[in-house]
């Protein structure tokens, strides 16, 4: 027999032996299913048990929710985005390096991108905190563009008049 004749036999044997030694990964087990009409409140963590099941960790215990449609998974998880801490989001997918996560329609999670819809991002700020500052113009040094400065000098013909008219302190 030539090696060419043995190739299909060896390939089949290798596939059979190799396949039996590969560990099989099963979907993570969830708690017993509880039929709820609405997602529980104040939940602080979640896990996807398989493509169609989500388990919510709440103060009262772990509640499993198995939606009939995969689109409902997004709605269940996004209702608790306000209570997810940064560390919980990071532990879901550590390769994202504390960046927001994006929740796919079927429940899978990936690192968020700039063009993702904000309503399905986990760990993103809903608003940027800010504080109003009272501006006191006499204490602020304004930066003037060179073109604007030269126009004012040309118009007033004197540097000291230019400064007084424009109200700028040039450094």
UniProtKB/Swiss-Prot annotation:
Primary localization class, coarse: virion
First and last residue of the signal peptide: none
Cystine connections: none
GO cellular component: membrane; virion membrane
GO biological process, one term: entry receptor-mediated virion attachment to host cell
Localization terms from the record: Virion membrane
Keywords: Host-virus interaction, Membrane, Viral attachment to host cell, Viral attachment to host entry receptor, Virion, Virus entry into host cell
Record's function text: Plays a role in viral entry into host cells. Forms a pentameric complex at the surface of the viral envelope together with gH, gL, UL130 and UL131. This complex is required for entry in epithelial, endothelial and myeloid host cells. Mechanistically, engages host receptor(s) including neurophilin 2/NRP2 to mediate infection. Additionally, monomeric UL128 may interfere with certain inflammatory cytokines to increase infection and dissemination by blocking monocytes migration.
Family per record: Belongs to the HHV-5 UL128 protein family.
Subunit text: Forms the envelope pentamer complex (PC) composed of gH, gL, UL128, UL130, and UL131A. The pentamer interacts with host NRP2.
Protein name: Uncharacterized protein UL128
């Amino acid at each position: 027999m030539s090696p060419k004749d043995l190739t299909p036999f060896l390939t089949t044997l290798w596939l059979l032996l190799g396949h039996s030694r590969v560990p099989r990964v099963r979907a993570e087990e969830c708690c017993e299913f509880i039929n709820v009409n609405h997602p529980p409140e104040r939940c602080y963590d979640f896990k996807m048990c398989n493509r169609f099941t989500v388990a919510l960790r709440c103060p009262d215990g772990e509640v499993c929710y198995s939606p009939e449609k995969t689109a409902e998974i997004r709605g269940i998880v996004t209702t608790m985005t306000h209570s997810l801490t940064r560390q919980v989001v990071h532990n879901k997918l550590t390769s994202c390096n504390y960046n927001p996560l994006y929740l796919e329609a079927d429940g899978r999670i990936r690192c968020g991108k700039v063009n993702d819809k904000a309503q399905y991002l986990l760990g993103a700020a809903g608003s940027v905190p800010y504080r109003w500052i009272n501006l006191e113009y006499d204490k602020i040094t304004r930066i003037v563009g060179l073109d604007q400065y030269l126009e004012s000098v040309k118009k007033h013909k004197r540097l000291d008049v230019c400064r007084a008219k424009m109200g700028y302190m040039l450094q």
